[in-house]
């Protein structure tokens, strides 16, 4: 699991916050990539995963805190991420270097304005999702 985001920009920091919640509490590798996920590509390639789940704040129809699963191709094709740089290159590199299936677990942010802390709706979603992951109660991931 690759968690992305900037903790200095409100809900954009949901990835690193989620990584902190899960690290050491699940049976798979959780990487806090912060604002530079490209710096973790070597680590990920050495792990030889068959599936990579990228956790990030993503814009889509719905309410803040809503979750949507995207395929790597889906996110790479358009500007739905909160980041200025398209994640397309990262996704393509990870797919090429690992052969892994790549999914994006997108959580709709309420705000990505400067400032620390998550909105209540995003924090509630992360807590519920972390609880389910720690108890291994989630079904197989499928892109929407």
Give a label for each model feature:
Residues 1-109, 116-144:
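N-terminal catalytic or cofactor-binding beta/alpha core of small enzyme domains
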């Amino acid at each position: 699991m690759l968690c992305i985001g900037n903790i200095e920009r409100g809900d954009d920091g949901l990835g690193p916050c989620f990584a902190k919640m899960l690290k050491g509490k699940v049976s798979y590798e959780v990487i806090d990539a912060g604002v530079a996920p490209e710096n973790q590509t070597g680590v990920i390639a050495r792990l030889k995963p068959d599936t990579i789940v990228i956790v990030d704040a993503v814009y889509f129809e719905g309410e803040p805190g809503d979750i949507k699963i995207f395929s790597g191709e889906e996110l790479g094709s358009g500007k739905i991420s909160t980041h200025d740089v398209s994640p397309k290159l990262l996704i393509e590199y990870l797919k090429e270097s690992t052969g892994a299936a790549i999914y994006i677990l997108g959580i709709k942010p309420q705000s990505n304005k400067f400032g620390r802390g998550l909105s209540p709706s995003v924090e509630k979603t992360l807590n519920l999702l972390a609880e389910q992951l720690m108890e291994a109660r989630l079904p197989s991931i499928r892109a929407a």
